[in-house]
Every structure is written in structure tokens, then in C-alpha cells.
């Protein structure tokens, strides 16, 4: 009897196993994406788009021109942003300052690194994506990444 029970349990266990992988409907996996020249262009545009986010733009202004004599704080409202800007204006930046974070620039750097890593593979798959296209995309991503590193080093040093 034990022999029959173990055979039945083993057959049920084998039938219940499924070889398919469940993929999310709202996301694209790398294996399905990096196939065409247009998809590389989408990722290059995405890197530029992430550079234009409000977080990045606000920090570039605050880390750049705001610290010069050309811009000055005139608002006396007492909110978190004004307090953070007052700290920067007084060159007394605390670790809790909302502008003392660098994650948004590392998001841009990550997008550039992904393009630099995956774009060469597309040349082998899509003949319309030439070496000239790749070199153009590569140089843009290297320049954008270097700009982000420039701002990070200028403001946070090593």
C-alpha cells in the first residue's frame, strides 16, 4: 500500500510542476528588448530624459549658480525647501539637507551604463544599427555620464 501511495504522490508532484516562467505584464525583460536600433535610441532618450527630471535640474541649479553671488535667497517662508536652501546659502550644509543627496544623478549614470553595456550586442542582431550609430550613442552616453560625475565630484569631492 505504501508503494502505491508514494507512486501516486510522485505522479501528482510531477504533474504540478510547470516549466514556464511567469513574466510581469507591465515590464520588459532584457532578453526581449535589446533587439533593434530603435530600442537603443529609446534607451539613449531615456538617459537624457532622466537627466531632465526635476530632482536633477533642481540639484544642478542649487549646486551651481545658487552658490554664486548671482542668485540670492529672498523668501522668508519657513518650509523644508527654504531651510535647505538657507543652509546651502550660508555654506552650512547638514546631512539631513534634501539637496545633499546624489541618487538622482546615479540613476542617470546607471542608464548610461546600461546603454554602454547592451548596445554593442544590438549591432550583431540588427544590421541597420551600424558601428557609426553605436559610436554616436556611445559618445553621447560617455559625455552624459562624465557630466554627472563632474557635478558629483565638484560637490561631494571623492
Residue ranges of model-derived segments:
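Membrane-proximal, proline-rich intrinsically disordered regions
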Residues: 17-67
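Conserved, well-structured interaction surfaces
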Residues: 41, 49, 80-156
